[in-house]
From Swiss-Prot:
It is an enzyme of class 5 (isomerase). InterPro entries: L-rhamnose_isomerase (IPR050337), Rhamnose_isomerase (IPR009308), Xyl_isomerase-like_sf (IPR036237). This is L-rhamnose isomerase. Binds 1 Mn(2+) ion per subunit. Pathway: Carbohydrate degradation; L-rhamnose degradation; glycerone phosphate from L-rhamnose: step 1/3. Catalyzes the interconversion of L-rhamnose and L-rhamnulose. Belongs to the rhamnose isomerase family. It catalyses: L-rhamnopyranose = L-rhamnulose. GO terms for molecular function: L-rhamnose isomerase activity; manganese ion binding. Gene3D superfamilies: Divalent-metal-dependent TIM barrel enzymes. One of its GO terms (cellular component) is cytoplasm. Its EC number is 5.3.1.14. GO terms for biological process: L-lyxose metabolic process; rhamnose catabolic process. It comes from Listeria monocytogenes serotype 4a (strain HCC23).
Length: 420
């Protein structure tokens, strides 16, 4: 009780300090509580899935490390996810890939149906979570010569077109059952290792294949689709068919959400700078918040400059209503539950930091060319008691404050993970 009282006291002091510059902390906390983060399932087992868990991870991505305790079954993964969600304030979503089927049937990617994900839906209902989805265009024998939907081989294309169509029905099923729109994100890793002669034709094939996948109109109350670009991957260093320009054009002309992954661009390029432009021309955005270290390494999200900028762009430009925030990282060198907790809580913190700015006043100063005040206030804000507001948010949402969550993760590791 003593700690709770101390947290509340510190919050009251922080509240008054923010109030003095025109910031309503209660409003900020209410807004933050309503923001759902789509936490990705694949951190829990290093992107192996349950369709062919012993198969090779392909698609130009890589999970490094061998930390003990990875989930090997859907039940174990759900148990780990429950632990992670219990340490994160608010109610959120889970982002599933197609390879995370939960069925005793022997089923291939072009055969999956909603029934193969029913245990996930029942669990999500119990936990009060929404579900997002992703067709899996990698780690499969039909990922041939680095191609799926853009393959010159019609048999290969047709296999993946069918997979894409079936993924849409699964996402629709999630939306209907859970009462929350399910975002179905299409990332296709097709590409070439060395300089291609023909960049145009594979892109035409990809466009036509996607058009076939999306031919049936589905109710967007239940499912919305996003398309995700990438600059390069391992084995596709010279050319990726689904580039940023390709998917920006495709998304805008086909009325799809555009997915921006923080690691899918040139190392000096940031997605925070793209959000305001896409907001003007696209129907909306799906974010994959990640941390690239010199390449698309999918490191756990930390409170770095880009994460802070993403939060600012979403809040300052009032883009939260058209943005779906998801995470995408997988680090097998650390405790996987800790990875989820650190990444998700940091994403929430970046949003709270932005919500605690006097945005309207700062915009007015900028409009009036009062750059002196703009700089002075934004710099002074760096020393404001943001941490006390965050700790209070954790307390009122019934999750551990400060590093207390780490004790729970360590205990869970000892009791559960190390016994697997």
């Amino acid at each position: 009780m003593g700690q709770e009282t101390e947290i509340s006291k510190r919050y009251q002091v922080a509240k008054e300090r923010y109030q003095a510059i025109g910031v309503d902390t209660e409003k900020a906390l209410k807004t933050l509580k309503d923001i759902k983060i789509s936490m990705h399932c694949w951190q829990g087992d290093d992107v192996k899935g349950f369709l062919n868990p012993d198969g090779e991870l392909t698609g130009g991505i890589m999970a490094t490390g061998n930390y003990p305790g990875a989930a090997h079954t859907p039940k174990q993964l759900r148990q780990d996810l429950e632990k992670a969600y219990s340490l994160i304030p608010g109610k959120h979503k889970l982002n599933l890939h197609a390879i995370y089927v939960d069925t005793d049937e022997k089923v291939d990617l072009n055969e999956i149906e909603p029934k193969h994900f029913t245990p996930w839906v029942e669990w999500a209902k119990e936990q009060g979570l929404g579900l997002d989805f992703n067709p899996t265009f990698f780690s499969h024998p039909m990922f041939k010569d680095n191609y799926t939907l853009a393959s010159p081989d019609k048999e290969v294309r047709d296999f993946w077109i069918e997979h894409g169509k079936r993924s849409r029905k699964i996402s629709e099923y999630f939306g209907k059952e859970l009462g929350q729109t399910s975002i179905n994100n299409f990332w296709v890793p097709d590409g070439i290792k060395d300089c291609p002669i023909d960049r145009y034709t594979p892109r035409k094939r990809l466009m036509e294949a996607l058009d076939e996948v999306f031919a049936e109109k589905l109710d967007e109350k239940y499912t919305q689709e996003a398309v995700e670009s990438k600059l390069f991957g391992l084995g596709a260093e010279a050319y990726t068919v689904g580039s940023h320009e390709f998917y920006m054009g495709y998304g805008i002309t086909r009325d799809k959400l555009i997915c921006l992954d923080a690691g899918h661009f040139h190392p000096t390029e940031v997605i925070s700078n793209k959000l305001s432009s896409l907001a003007l021309f696209s129907k909306g955005v799906m974010l994959h918040v990640s941390r690239p270290v010199r390449w698309d390494s999918d490191h756990v999200v930390i409170m770095d400059d880009e994460l802070i900028e993403i939060g600012r762009e979403l809040v300052r430009n009032d883009l939260l209503g058209i943005t779906n925030i998801g995470l995408d990282f997988f680090d097998a060198t650390i405790n996987r539950i800790a990875a989820w907790v650190v990444g998700t809580r940091n994403t929430q913190k970046s949003l709270l930091k932005a919500l605690l700015e006097p945005t309207a006043d700062l915009k007015k100063m900028e409009l009036e060319n009062d750059f002196t005040s703009r700089m002075a206030i934004t710099e002074e804000l760096k020393d404001f008691p943001f941490g006390d507001v965050w700790n209070y948010f954790c307390e009122i949402n019934g999750v551990p404050v400060g590093l207390d969550w780490l004790k729970e993760v360590k205990a869970y590791e000892e009791d559960v993970l190390l016994k697997r």
